[in-house]
Amino acid sequence: MPVIKVRENEPFDVALRRFKRSCEKAGILSEVRRRESYEKPTWERKRKKAAAVKRAAKKVSRENARRVRMY
């Protein structure tokens, strides 16, 4: 759990913004959304594999675009 110390004469809005930023960096909200409903292990593996395939295709696409620009 992210903890921030409110500084002397610090407005509430600024402290809240710092807290939100620290929560985002810690990945709390994404973790809560992920655990909101149960995901079967097979679905999780399928989702992760699809993401890996997408990343690989994106990487190849970038490499091809880089080669085209060199000539």
From Swiss-Prot:
InterPro entries: Ribosomal_bS21, Ribosomal_bS21_CS, Ribosomal_bS21_sf. Residues 49-71 are annotated as: Disordered. Pfam families: Ribosomal_S21. Gene3D superfamilies: Ribosomal protein S8. Residues 49-59 have a biased composition (Basic residues). GO terms for cellular component: ribonucleoprotein complex; ribosome. GO terms for biological process: translation. PROSITE patterns: RIBOSOMAL_S21. GO terms for molecular function: structural constituent of ribosome. Keywords: Ribonucleoprotein, Ribosomal protein. Residues 60-71 have a biased composition (Basic and acidic residues). The keyword Ribonucleoprotein applies. Coiled coil: none annotated. Belongs to the bacterial ribosomal protein bS21 family. This is Small ribosomal subunit protein bS21. The gene is rpsU.
